[in-house]
Amino acid sequence: ALLIGVGPGAACTTRGVLGIGVPQVTATVDAATARDFYHKRTGKYIPIITDGGMNRGGDICKAFACGADAVMIGSSFARAKEAPGRGYHWGMATSHVNLPRGTRIYVGATGSLKEILFGPAKVDDGSQNLMGALKTSMGSLGAANLKQMHDVEIIIAPSIQTEGKIFQVDQRVGMGK
C-alpha cells in the first residue's frame, strides 16, 4: 500500500518546517492516476491510503472519490471520549529533538467513538456520523461500493464550503464555523 499525505494532519507541522507538501485532494488524485497507469501496465494494483486532514465526513468522501482505497483518521478518533489522550492528539510526526515537526494539540472530547463513527450526530459540522456521511455521499453519487467511488466525476469549486451558506457563515453554525 502507498500512504499519501505530507503535512495535512491536524497536529503536523511538516509543511511549515520543511516547506514541502501538496494539498490532500491533489496528492490523492495524482497518486491514483499513477497507480492506475501502473496497474494497466503491470497488472499489479497498489492500494492508496490517504492520511491527514480527514476531519469530516466530506473529507473522507472526497478521498475515496479521488482514488483512495482507505483513509487514516487521527484527530477525529482523538476526540472520542474513550480515547487515551483525554482530548489531546499527537500526530504521526511527533516532536523530535533533531527535527521537530509535529505537535500535541488539544482537540477536546466531542462524543463517543460510536457517535463519531455511526451517530447520531450531536453537532452540525460533519465531524460525527462519519459512516453515515460516506453512505449518503455514495448513494447521492450512485456508487454501490468504494471502488465505484473512484469513478465518480469530480468538479472543483473554489468556494464549495461556503457557497450559498451566507446565513451559516453569519450565524457561525454548520459550515460557517
Annotated model-derived regions:
Residues 1-3, 14, 21:
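Helix-rich catalytic cores of soluble enzyme domains
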Residues 19-50, 55-177:
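Alpha/beta catalytic cores of nucleotide-metabolism and tRNA/nucleoside-modifying enzymes
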Residues 6-16:
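Gly-rich Lys/Arg/Thr-decorated short loops/hinges at beta-loop-alpha junctions or inter-strand turns
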Residues 1-8, 73-74:
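Non-cysteine beta-strand/loop elements that form the S-adenosyl-L-methionine
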